[in-house]
């Protein structure tokens, strides 16, 4: 039968017909169930087909495969891609994984030539290549989503460069800041997240294809060619490492975990800020839910779920770390469990980024309430201490003591610092003047924070412009 003629097997094809030559009997139903990964690794179909097409092209170029067989294989792979994307592909659990499902279907379509595609290749380097390609695509998707969230945060920061709010330590009012300044803190966090994903992509971008099972191959393959076709920078230098390495997946999960923590911290603040006790912002209906029993409730469920899902991403990292920690070189079946944590983390992170982007784009800061809260809790006490240092030459530690004593006086009287009379204040520090009263204003406080990275409104506007320029230049290569 010619290589281009479809072959119909006389027995039902299973994975064991691919590797079962040395076995007397097939696997049990339980073995097939625990061994099968098609339920989740079917997501690798685009990458698997791309890797197979690159491998086929190289085999033809090096004379290992005939041009006729190569054309048949490439045509069959294109047809399989179309079938999968149309939802017409006959996936089979008995064929274990996406690689065997595609190979089996290719044999149905083009016959014996399909069996030549696996020349100089193992499932070990095949899956390592597919997985790297998938993670690379996921990194590009996540990085783009983070860039959009960054842009939304910068836009909102520009809008609220002058909006005064309380800054907190220990969740206690600390010093006045601007809402824009607060949002820019998350812009910086997300910038580092983008950098981590970019760095992971750089290290990921070496091709394991051609490593074969673990030792390389005796066929005269061109690994540089397949690497170039697939957009890798180079082939990996060691065949054992090529099939054993999952650092790229761990780095992706580590970057995803840190990004999830940042999203969770912002989500926690939204939960706090939307509470009646704070009342700093209002979430739109699109990102809120109600109660089945309490008609008045307006719950920040989207923010709460972003906060919760960070734990799942962190758990995915822990899961893969534990899988990999004790594995000898090269491939062990444990590594089949490397994909589900990565798939789940990528899906979860992209959903959380989308939810956070939507929330931050549509929240309504309650400007008057923010300003009122900024002046509560003696938040300008540090400004008074700084004035004592600048105007009177008081050592800061003594200035701190004086300001603290004035806070105690105001607290006992049940008033704010700015409500104390100058005469009352002079009972603590006789050298105080009317100028000291001025520094107790929250507006004066934020305007005075002009040091680089500070909260002064002009600083915030300049920081927004700088952030747009800086982070736009950090987009990873596509």
Curated annotation (Swiss-Prot):
**Matches recorded under InterPro entries:** Arg_succ_lyase_C, Argininosuccinate_lyase, Fumarase/histidase_N, Fumarate_lyase_CS, Fumarate_lyase_fam, Fumarate_lyase_N, L-Aspartase-like
GO MF term (any one): argininosuccinate lyase activity
Listed under catalytic activity are: 2-(N(omega)-L-arginino)succinate = fumarate + L-arginine
Disulfide partners: none
Q: In which pathway does it act?
A: Amino-acid biosynthesis; L-arginine biosynthesis; L-arginine from L-ornithine and carbamoyl phosphate: step 3/3
Q: Which GO CC terms are listed, alphabetically?
A: cytosol
Give the enzyme class.
lyase
One family from Pfam that matches here is: Lyase_1
- SUPFAM superfamilies, A to Z: L-aspartase-like
In terms of PANTHER family, this protein maps to: ARGININOSUCCINATE LYASE
Q: What is this protein called?
A: Argininosuccinate lyase
Q: What species does this protein belong to? A: Rhodospirillum rubrum (strain ATCC 11170 / ATH 1.1.1 / DSM 467 / LMG 4362 / NCIMB 8255 / S1)
Name of the coding gene: argH
């Amino acid at each position: 039968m010619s290589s281009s003629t479809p072959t119909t097997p006389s027995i039902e094809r299973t994975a064991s017909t691919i590797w079962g030559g040395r076995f007397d009997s097939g696997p049990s139903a339980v073995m097939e169930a625990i061994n099968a990964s098609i339920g989740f690794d079917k997501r690798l179909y685009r990458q698997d087909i791309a890797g197979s097409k690159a491998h086929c092209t190289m085999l033809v170029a090096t004379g290992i495969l005939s041009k006729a067989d190569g054309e048949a294989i490439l045509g069959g792979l294109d047809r399989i891609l179309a079938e999968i994307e149309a939802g017409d592909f006959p996936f089979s659990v008995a064929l274990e994984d996406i690689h065997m499902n595609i190979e089996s279907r290719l044999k149905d379509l083009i016959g014996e030539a399909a069996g030549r595609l696996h020349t100089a290749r193992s499932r070990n380097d095949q899956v390592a290549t597919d997985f790297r390609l998938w993670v690379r695509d996921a990194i590009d998707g996540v990085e783009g989503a983070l860039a959009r969230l960054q842009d939304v945060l910068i836009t909102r920061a520009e809008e609220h460069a002058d909006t005064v709010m309380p800054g907190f330590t220990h969740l206690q009012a600390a010093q006045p800041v601007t809402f824009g300044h607060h949002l820019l803190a998350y812009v910086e966090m997300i910038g580092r997240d983008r950098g981590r994903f970019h760095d992971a992509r750089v290290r990921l971008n070496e091709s394991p294809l051609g490593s074969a099972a673990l030792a390389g191959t005796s066929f005269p393959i061109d690994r540089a060619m397949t690497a170039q076709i697939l957009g890798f920078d180079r082939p990996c230098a060691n065949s054992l490492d090529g099939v054993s390495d999952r650092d790229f997946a761990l780095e992706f999960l580590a970057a995803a975990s840190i990004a999830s923590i940042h999203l969770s911290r912002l989500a926690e603040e939204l939960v706090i800020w939307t509470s009646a006790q704070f009342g700093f912002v209002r979430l739109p209906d699109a990102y809120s839910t109600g109660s089945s029993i309490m008609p008045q409730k307006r719950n920040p469920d989207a923010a709460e779920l972003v906060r919760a899902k960070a734990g799942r991403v962190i758990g995915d990292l822990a899961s893969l770390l534990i899988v990999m920690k004790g594995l000898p070189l090269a491939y062990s079946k444990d590594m089949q469990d490397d994909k589900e944590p990565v798939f789940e983390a990528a899906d979860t992170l992209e959903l959380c980024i989308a939810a956070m982007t939507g929330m931050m784009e549509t929240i309504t800061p309650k400007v008057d309430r923010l300003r009122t809260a900024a002046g509560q809790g003696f938040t300008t006490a540090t400004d008074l201490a700084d004035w004592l240092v600048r105007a009177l030459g008081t050592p800061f530690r003594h200035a701190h003591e004086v300001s603290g004593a004035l806070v105690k006086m105001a607290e006992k009287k049940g008033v704010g610092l700015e409500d104390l009379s100058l005469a009352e204040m002079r009972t603590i520090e006789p050298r105080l003047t009317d100028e000291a009263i001025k520094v107790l204003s929250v507006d004066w406080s934020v305007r005075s924070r002009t040091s680089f990275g500070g909260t002064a409104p002009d600083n915030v506007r300049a920081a927004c412009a700088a952030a747009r320029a800086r982070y736009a230049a950090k987009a990873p290569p596509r």
